[in-house]
């Protein structure tokens, strides 16, 4: 008897796929005890976006902090276009680095990196500041939980804060 039927064919949402197959996106998971552990890849992916802005001449400062396993990266570049913030953080293969119009230099994964960080984090917050307005989106395991758009006096740029999921990374360093 053949047990391979239509019921065995599954389609995963983008975040489910990343969470089930993180090795495709960040290499091995790891707890930080090895320099190639995925926990460091998450940090690098967020930093790379800020470095791209800096390398293009936008913003002269990148602030990185880690406290109680919460990583925060703030750049003072152009900021992500506000109406594209949620899509940029949660729709696979979406980004501005596929051609050289907006980014002549890029070290990022071109539409994948920040989504992997989002999906592999228990708490992921991204906020863009542009020309007196701010758009914020918060996710848990890649699922949008909160969003807000407000007026602001903050300088242009992007703020990303994340707490990696200990279910996946263990008690990481």
Predicted ranges, named:
Residues 21-25, 50-53, 57, 91-95, ...:
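Conserved, well-folded catalytic cores of nucleic-acid-processing
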